Amino acid sequence: MSQEFLARILEQKAREVEQMKLEQIQPLRQTYRLAEFLKNHQDCLQVIAEVKKASPSLGDINLDVDIVQQAQTYEENGAVMISVLTDEVFFKGHLDYLREISSQVEIPTLNKDFIIDEKQIIRARNAGATVILLIVAALSEERLKELYDYATELGLEVLVETHNLAELEVAHRLGAEIIGVNNRNLTTFEVDLQTSVDLAPYFEEGRYYISESAIFTGQDAERLAPYFNGILVGTALMQAENVVQRIKELQIDKG
């Protein structure tokens, strides 16, 4: 995802937010806290499993998928959380997907989108999300803090996404409890698991780290397991002929 492409996405989000109605805040869906679960289950590399029909880099991935059935398969086979793409223009997602999945699973759901405004946070919570994504590269540090604080005040957890050391330091200054490392280079659009490995020496005690993107095989997961609490996997699961087998391959025993 080049900076130019990221800018295009953010311009689109700004237009969407401008048209978006401010929803009344609904009760928070009840499930376990992701950070607490990660704290108490550090003997295994946890899998955050994603429902994603398409992406800008790959185009269509799996347009015909039964999203609820896919999410329930994830849940039944030990996923710690379901990530749901809700961006319509670039990822062919929809807020209704989050709403439908959240109503049919008991584990946490993540609203995977480019969040730049409080209205989106309320909308995510009302659709059943218990975790939202905030991307350091998409926000000023001041705006990031405002949105982070607002989300936590609403009882949501936040996955703060980083890609390099400077962004990781921003997440640390923020006090983020759950931090993602995206293996996708925002300048070249290339992906490299080494991104996660290289940032690992800078991780801090008391925080939980998730590696995102470019994770396809058990070997990939084993490479990340010494450093991370979990991995976020989308394409590999959406393309898998045997989803159950694939998710089991990714759940690495760290004991």
Swiss-Prot record:
Gene3D superfamilies (alphabetical): Aldolase class I
Highest taxon of the lineage: Bacteria
Pfam families: IGPS
GO MF annotations, alphabetized: indole-3-glycerol-phosphate synthase activity; phosphoribosylanthranilate isomerase activity
This protein's UniProt keywords: Amino-acid biosynthesis, Aromatic amino acid biosynthesis, Decarboxylase, Lyase, Tryptophan biosynthesis
Class in the EC hierarchy, top level: lyase
Annotated pathway: Amino-acid biosynthesis; L-tryptophan biosynthesis; L-tryptophan from chorismate: step 4/5
Catalytic activity: 1-(2-carboxyphenylamino)-1-deoxy-D-ribulose 5-phosphate + H(+) = (1S,2R)-1-C-(indol-3-yl)glycerol 3-phosphate + CO2 + H2O
Single GO biological process annotation from the record: L-tryptophan biosynthetic process
EC number: 4.1.1.48
HAMAP family: IGPS_B
Family named by the database record: Belongs to the TrpC family.
Protein name, UniProt field: Indole-3-glycerol phosphate synthase
